[in-house]
Amino acid sequence: MGKYFDMLMEDVRMKEGLHSCMNCGVCTGVCPAAEFYNYDPRQIVNIVQTRDDDAIEELLKSDTIWYCGECMSCRPRCPRGNTPGYVIQALRTLSQKLGFFVESEKGRQQLALKRIIGENILRTGYCIVPRLVKPELHPEQGTVWQWIYDNDKEVYGQFTPVYMRHGAGALRRLDEQSLEDCLLYTSDAA
C-alpha cells in the first residue's frame, strides 16, 4: 500500500502542492473545469491522500486527471496552501511514465497533440504552423479559416515581412542547420 503515493512524492510538485488537505472544497468551488465536467479537484486530492494504490491507479487510468486546465485558480485560494493543480500535474506525469494514460481517451488525445506539436517543431521550428492546419481536417474552423489558409501570405504578411521566408522575424523559415540542431538537441536529451 502506498507505492504509487511514494512515486508521486518523488515529484517536486507533490511536495509543493500537497500539505494537508482538510477537504473544504474551495478548490472545486473556484475551478473552471468543474463547471464543464464531472470534476472535483478536492476528491482527487482526497484519493491521493488515502495512499490507496487501487484508487490512485484508477485515477491514473481515468479521464479525470486530464480535465484540469492548469489555470491554478486553486493555488491562491486554498486556506492550507495546497495546490491541487500541482498534484494533478504530478498524477499526469506518473500516468505517462507508467503508460496508464493510454487507458484514458483524454490521455490518448494528449499524446496525439504532443506528437503533432513535436513533429511541427522538428519540421519547421514552430509549435503551430498555420499552413499545416488544413481546413479539410478542421471543418469546425469554418469558411473564415479556409479564406485565411488560401490567403496566408497576404494575411500573415501584415504581421511579419518574412512569413515562411528566410530572414529575421516571427514566422520566418528556419534554415536547415537550425532545424538539424533542434533534432540533435532533442535526440541528445532523450
Place the predicted regions along the sequence by residue.
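Ferredoxin-type iron-sulfur electron-transfer modules in oxidoreductases and energy-metabolism complexes
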Residues: 1-13, 36-67, 81-146, 162
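Cysteine-centered iron-sulfur cluster-binding motifs in ferredoxin-type domains/subunits
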Residues: 16-35, 62-82
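A hydrophobic membrane-anchoring alpha-helix module
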Residues: 157-174
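C-terminal helical accessory/scaffold domains
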Residues: 172-183
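Conserved small/polar residues in nucleotide/adenosyl-binding loops
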Residues: 185-190
